A protein has these predicted regions:
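Structured catalytic core of nucleotide-sugar glycosyltransferases
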Residues: 1-132
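Hydrophobic helical membrane-anchoring modules
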Residues: 2-5, 181-315
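Residue-level recognition of specific faces of alpha-helices
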Residues: 10, 41, 65, 77, ...
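Residues in soluble alpha-helical coiled-coils and helical-bundle/repeat scaffolds
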Residues: 16-19, 101, 105, 173, ...
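Residues that scaffold the ATP/ADP-binding catalytic core of kinase and kinase-like folds
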Residues: 55, 171-172, 196
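Conserved catalytic core of Hanks-type protein kinase domains
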Residues: 59, 87, 113, 148, ...
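Acceptor/aglycone-binding surface of glycosyltransferases and processive sugar-polymer synthases
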Residues: 69-73, 77-87, 104-180, 201-211, ...
Length: 315
């Protein structure tokens, strides 16, 4: 099947995208038409509080190639992306954000590279990280922590933008994590993958606050690694050994001669270990929370409305 006859799906999400979505659709359509004569654009509204969805609905009325999936609330970027992939019907699927920081025009070159390298996933890799100093520092810290504590290695400055084959996406969707972290999951899929270096523009402020970045880091580590638990066990065993040694030393000192008071140092040690115990308990609580979310088996997201020129329904 030639590249111009293979069905192409372009998948994106909406969240406060009112300023960019109209231009994005225009550019995405043009980019898609250069790659395939059979395209669709699947847009997922992740509970956006602005008028982004209304703009897309106007496009749906004019172009049958565009469909809009409205989630019942904000479920999060990673879940919204997976909803879009679940509804994409193409032989090739191009996942990209709608904020125009990743140019849709990269699609044509990525399609050529995908065919040339014979891979199933070609993921974007930022040549240099955009954003403020704090964003860059927090980004580097995330990759450092994740690489140090996880069994899943992810490239630094990897983007969610990627061009994928149908079999790759079908395999990715077999993962049913209730709190998915997209990039590590995409690595776990396997299949031949390659990077596509690009420069990400900085057109708007990030919607990922520091708090959301910290939460995502904690979720990624506790979802994909048991190393923190192993480190806790090793540290506890080491402290227990040192405690036994120190206890023996105290007993010997007491038998040999008088013991001087040392309440200040004793309290410092007690407070330190109580604090350490609180940290360990909190970390274990995160793991228990992840287990609880999985066993409850709640839906990962809920689609409220599906809009297309052929279908307009509420679910």
């Amino acid at each position: 099947m030639s590249s111009m006859t293979r069905k192409l799906s372009i998948v994106t999400t909406l969240y406060r995208s009112m300023d960019t979505i109209d231009e994005f659709i225009q550019r995405a359509l043009a980019a898609g038409e250069a790659v395939s004569d059979d395209i669709e654009i699947v847009i997922v509204d992740d509970g956006s509080p602005d008028a982004s969805a209304n703009i897309v609905r106007n496009w749906v009325e004019r172009d049958a190639r565009i469909s809009l999936l409205r989630l019942s609330r904000n479920f999060g970027h990673h879940k919204a992306m997976l909803v879009g992939l679940e509804h994409a019907q193409g032989d090739l699927i191009f996942l990209i954000d709608s904020d125009l920081e990743e140019p849709p025009e990269l699609l044509s070159e990525m399609a050529q590279v995908l065919r040339g390298k014979a891979v199933d996933c070609l993921y974007g890799l930022q040549e240099r990280r955009k954003g403020s100093r704090m964003e860059r520092i927090s980004g580097h810290l995330f990759y450092w922590l994740f690489s140090a504590l996880s069994e899943v290695g992810i490239p630094q400055n990897v983007s969610t933008m990627r061009l994928m084959t149908r079999r790759y996406v079908s395999a990715l969707l077999k993962f049913r994590d209730k709190n998915p972290v997209f990039v590590p999951l995409s690595i776990l899929v396997g299949y031949p993958q390659a990077s596509f270096p690009f420069i990400k523009a900085s057109t708007s402020d990030t919607t990922y606050s520091l708090g959301r970045r910290i939460a995502l880091t904690a979720l990624a580590i506790t979802t994909f690694s048991a190393k923190p638990l192993i480190l806790m066990l090793c540290f506890s065993l080491m402290m227990a050994f040192l405690g036994i040694v120190y206890g023996g030393f105290v007993v010997v000192r007491a038998l040999i001669g008088p013991v001087q008071d040392g309440w200040a140092s004793l309290m410092a040690v007690v407070v330190f270990f109580f604090s350490l115990n609180a940290v360990f308990t909190g970390l274990m609580g995160l793991y228990v929370k992840q287990i609880l979310e999985e066993v409850k088996d709640r839906p990962r997201s809920i689609i409220q409305d599906i809009y297309s020129k052929r279908n307009s329904s509420e679910t």
